[in-house]
Amino acid sequence: AAQRAVEGTESVDAQEQYVLALIMNSDYAKARQYIQLKQLDASRPTLRHVLKMSEFSERIQQGIQAAKNAVTMNRGEEAFISLDAVLAEMKAYEAQLPADPALRRHFYYEYIFALNARNLAEQAVAQIAKTGVGPMEMPTYVRHALADSYLRMRQPKKAEKLYKSLFAEKNYADYNVYAGLYFSLIEQEKFKEADKLLVEMDKQLPTFMYSNAKGVDKVTHDDRTEFIGLKGLNYVYRKEHAKAERYFNEIVAKAPANISYQNNLAIVQRWREKPELSQQTLDQWNSVEPIDQSSQITSMQNAQALGQIQSWRQQTQRLMRSAGDDTGVQQSKKALDDRRHATIQHRSTFSKSESDNDALLGRLKGSKEQESGTRLNSPWLNDNYRLFADHSNRWGDYEQGKIKDQRVGLGLEWASDRKAASIMLSQSTDGDRFGVQLDWSHWLNDHWSYALGFDSQADIPLQALAQGHEGEAYTMSLNWQANESRKAGAAYKLTDINDGNARQEFSAFFKQQLLQGPHYITSAALRGGYEKNDLGDYAPYFNPKQSYSAEAVLEHDWITWRSYDRHFSQHFEAAAGTFKQTGFSGKPIYNLYYQHDWQLSRTWKLNYGVGWGVHPYDGEDERRTYAVFGFEGRF
């Protein structure tokens, strides 16, 4: 009809309307030919720009849909071919933009939208200044794109403002808008507001989709499906892992064919320190093609947690090609890259002891003592091996002077598939006490692990060392955990000192988390110990024939400040119990400890703390004040 109306007329207005009609019908080639045929560039110079803007808009939408289809079909490496092509063309076309402010704004609005869809957040935000208006004055879809970009750039406060502005638009807010606002709140630690938003989402998001076709039943709306998953993950963000696992187990029982829910369950299982179970959950879908991308990412993270380095590396390399914009994949690559760097660990303890009986301190560790250990690790070699250098130093201040024990060592460590072994050769710095230390540990499954150790130059009491004695130590331990919140363990150590004393030590513990929240975890533990010494009181150091101890411990960890890779937390610990040794009645023991933990960056952390405790020995109390300092990081 438009073509018949314009045929035979020389009216420029009619010709313009005809071109606009062609544009509306996406007939861009014919519109371009008509502009050239009628030489409309002279009389309507902006018309070709209007055509180009419309063409860009349509190609952007097609590119976004093509990306979604490629991801669904597990062809992530092809996802952005179409979108990259239109972005390249838009970048080249920018120099041809007319002076008309409205057309220029329209171009940059579309450019921002496309850049955000391509996960190029910084570039999207950089276009704001070119529009000549503020973000709050922009169209709804552009504000949404900028909100997503700010969230990706770790600027959640700006994202929150833009997301909230979208709710003023009638019928615009869908799951994606709600979810964007939710994560902008979570990343600002606004957990209470995020909880309220979930309640509002439950009210506002549709539950079902209905079909007009006769006999077709209603189905769960996509927004509702996504919301059900987010509701479970909210428990995780609040550190309520048990609730999250219980929630997804119930959801999976109701919808066993939903891969997304199964993947969420697997994620929670890994966070609960059960990576084997997590992988078993995913393996149920091995025969389903194509493999869901989220499940591939979870499988990659499981390989990392299981110490399957080669598999972890292969999966990360593959996902970097198909899902390189995903933050989980990027973090995995950074963790792999970290293994190519040297690392360092250090811990020192300084203490001062007092007693009403000064002679008692001479049988313990002196009036002052220090213990420190530093280990420098090489980069990982061939994925599973690394060399390390170790320095340990301990000394005590006694009435007759300081007694020191300082050692340096070189070792080799191997780790793979939740097993680890190491050997270290060491030498004292002021003597010929050459030693060999062997260690082995193995996770049998998600719940049980054990460790074995041997040290030919054990850390025997300094008083025995000063008399020229040496000792060997044999250790073994067995640990159990239900998950991250409930753990128990037992250990045995035999120290054979060549002064005739054989010291046997048994210890056990049980630990249970009591309270969890977004910023805190409160735990309680029971610890017990038994010691037996063959030489008894004849030794020049504290050496009861037998001794027993039992104590209850309350711990509280509080994340005081957090910003992505950095955080500051405080640790409080209080312990009380009883100690009894042969020949003396039982007396109480106490200990208080307070520590600061700084995550300075993704790869460096620092801690320091102070403590005070009372412990009876030979019926007399030792009052000990101590300080702890430690750090670790990657060069």
Question: Positions of the model-derived regions?
Answer:
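Gram-negative and organellar
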Residues: 1-4, 8-635
